Amino acid sequence: MANKQDLIAKVAAATELTKKDSAAAVDAVFAAVTEYLSKGEKVQLIGFGNFEVRERAARKGRNPQTGKETKIAASKVPAFKAGKALKDAVK
């Protein structure tokens, strides 16, 4: 499994940037995606995939310790849908 540091190292090697500059670039991309999603906007990266905010409806839940039924409020969650090129690369 790759982590953020592995991603930074890969970006540094591919772009000939320093690891410090690569880390700044990776952080900037993550921050931009987060900012767009927090505003409810979709981020579409052709060939890679789409990041979007999906709404979860309110639903009934159950406390596993007591078995008591409870209401879970509606919420918004980030979601990612892989694009065709990414799906094909994974096959």
UniProtKB/Swiss-Prot annotation:
Keywords: DNA condensation, DNA-binding, Virulence
MF terms (GO), sorted A to Z: DNA binding; structural constituent of chromatin
Coiled coil: none
Keyword Nucleus set for record: no
CDD domains: HU
Entry annotated with the keyword DNA-binding: yes
Pfam families (UniProt xref): Bac_DNA_binding
GO CC annotation terms, alphabetical: cytosol
Any one Gene Ontology BP term: chromosome condensation
The organism's place on the tree of life at top rank: Bacteria
InterPro entries given in the database record: Hist_DNA-bd, Histone-like_DNA-bd_CS, IHF-like_DNA-bd_dom_sf
PANTHER family hit by this protein: DNA-BINDING PROTEIN HU, DNA-BINDING PROTEIN HU-BETA
Family: Belongs to the bacterial histone-like protein family.
Cited function: Histone-like DNA-binding protein which is capable of wrapping DNA to stabilize it, and thus to prevent its denaturation under extreme environmental conditions. Also seems to act as a fortuitous virulence factor in delayed sequelae by binding to heparan sulfate-proteoglycans in the extracellular matrix of target organs and acting as a nidus for in situ immune complex formation.
Protein name: DNA-binding protein HU
Biological source species: Streptococcus gordonii
